[in-house]
């Protein structure tokens, strides 16, 4: 018993003597249930901290086009790749989770990637909708500007935070509809992700356990609209559907996939002429989770395995590197105030052009 107490005290002292660890816990409001949990979390933090420092040293020497930083994910996952099942462009999982300062996180404590993946609730969802010929209309071969940023046109709402809920698909869907609604009406309305989380199960979505942007669009079309965020605020959990027709913020007629699939030139024409586009990406890499700024170039990122839905709001070039400007749903304390510049014209890196989709209003 005395030995156990002595060991526990040594662990507590060791973690307390790490100023970076103590600062990390303070900044992100981290709380742990036990000393053993804190020791494991501290180990993961140290691994990620070494990875970030090593990468940034190489980036400073010009070996990488982006930098990383420690953030709210740094005590949850290791540097190793997640395991994800192979999925096709017409059948993909788009879910991920986020962590906010001060949240009680003891119930999602993972020491291995397998435990983490199970905790995220990853699953394969099967499409139920029949393909409409209109979905696959080829993008017209038109000339577009070299640089596009729909934020400057007023077509993009503020960065949001999905919290402890695998609802990135809902944020991606609302983002593209917000843009199309603005371009048609001139009014930017923040739409309700919670409406989609709670009410689109019959279409095939799984709320906080994952979903599809296309099925979100089908729900909105069949439902006759989607509520505003103000009227139906986000709760980051599955709740009973309480859609209110008097709070309708936008609607749509159909949706279309950017075709040909996997074609970055087609996606560029879509983003350049249509507006913000919902896209699916591989976000499993530790480098993505710890992204800070610069053009994210990760050769190991899969072009065919997707687990995260985001919003392409523009594109351009920086210091000779082409990029996609992407809005994430992990809050403004991640990346470039919630955004990331992802490599463009790098063989469809991270699968960004594999299954892009947008609503028709």
PLM regions: where:
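Catalytic-core signature of thiol
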Residues: 2-361
